[in-house]
Amino acid sequence: MTNYRVFDGHCDTPIELWLQNQPLLENTLAVSLARAQRLGTWAQFFAFCTAWVEAKLPRPEIFARALDYFDAQLRENADKITLCRTASEAEAAMQSGKCAAFLAIEGAEAVREDEGLLERAYEMGVRMISLVWNLPNSLAAPCGS
């Protein structure tokens, strides 16, 4: 049997973990480390999308709290998952049998025009931002707007 590498370009698991106070290792969401073990070598973009979260807090605050929660989950599961910022880091993680994790923001309302939060996101490992989800924000709008 051929063992293929899996690279999933998107999941909303980080925000849901925070909202539901669930662990990354074992949860009822789309991605759990325990279930993903059977994949063998894999990489995952973990996306933070605040657009659809009921806004009891400002979107940047939701993002910051979810990012902190997910960072704690990554540290707690460091034997199974590695935060990657480059292709070479991903290759090293997968060669060691760990998930190569990349962070993404889906919809710029998570950072708005807050350069400080954008810098913090980059420092914490965010390497991809899609400017819009399905709603207009202060930086961009979807084509149907």
Regions found by a protein language model. Name each.
Residues 1-145:
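N-terminal hydrophobic targeting/anchoring segments and the immediately downstream early-domain regions
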